[in-house]
Amino acid sequence: MTIMRKSHPLFKIVNHAFIDLPTPPNISGWWNFGSLLGMCLILQILTGLFLAMHYTSDTLTAFSSVTHICRDVNFGWLIRYMHANGASLFFICLYIHIGRGIYYGSYLYKETWNIGILLLFLTMATAFVGYVLPWGQMSFWGATVITNLLSAIPYIGQDLVEWIWGGFSVDKATLTRFFAFHFILPFIIAALAMXHLLFLHETGSNNPLGIPSDSDKIPFHPYYSTKDFLGAIMLIMLFMTLVLYFPDKLGDPDNYTPANXLNTPPHIKPEWYFLFAYAILRSIPNKLGGVVALILSILVLALLPYLHTSNQRSLLFRPLSQFLFWTLVSDLLLLTWIGGQPVEPPFIIIGQMASILYFSIIXIFMPLAGLIENKMLKW
């Protein structure tokens, strides 16, 4: 008689994905972030569900309902701060996961990579509409500024913005629909994540060497299940330290002031995880040009499989490309800092130079470095 997990139609799927999955024997800690992202998503859905039980999506009561959650609901303060900081944790894991994909050439699995880019867009959309819900000053003005960018689209722009707002400004209709979007999107993300895994398991995981490991695979359980569990425990410890000791460290103090359409905050800026894209948006003086650059800053990732010129998959043995990769990371950190600064010299020119460097490294320097390395190795 066969084991139930190998014969039962439902358990068989789980078995092939998480138990008997053939896995490369040498994947490092950088491969932990996929499972950590799954954990983050579950955490966000659960905390979000409990918050939705007490939240009201009305302009008059939204702010006070969040205050009520923090003051009157049992452990409401904990649920709220876990959800707010859980978004930061999600994006930290997401950016490391993408960085690992670039470093080790995982983008050559095109279907998995493209679904990943779609997941990134959806996660960013979810985080944006979620940030509007507490209805503080930065929520209101962030929603106004970012949705207004769509008015740069020729001919239909203004109509599109008013259609999204549900009126002539960000108001009750906007808040209600943003709450609806914020509730449904994580489930769409979960469905896409399953498709992401499905395509990954079609090809098998990549590994740090970037070479096929078909002849030398080990089962996922107990080796990598234990490793993922250890990673999850470590991340939860760091996360709970942030939530319990520094819950407002990553937030904006302006969001503790109720939304007021008559009073503009001195510096309108998004959460830290959007600052790099915001800096790229602001670096172009033209509105439409800025919007295009903003979208391209993420969409440029889709070009990576087609710009791969090296005969090696991974950057592990390619010092020139490694230098460019870490320059790219530094550049993104610089853009993140610039995004939080006011629009004045010298920040304007630094932001513009960093934006040019960002696109140049991905689209010009990295493909060139691959060709140079091939030449040096006489390939």
From Swiss-Prot:
Cofactor binding note of this UniProt entry: Binds 2 heme b groups non-covalently.
Gene3D superfamilies noted in UniProt: Cytochrome Bc1 Complex, Chain C
GO biological process, one term: mitochondrial electron transport, ubiquinol to cytochrome c
Cofactor dependency: heme b
Name of one Pfam family that matches: Cytochrom_B_C
Signal peptide: none
PANTHER family xrefs: CYTOCHROME B
Protein name: Cytochrome b
Species for this entry: Thomomys townsendii (Western pocket gopher)
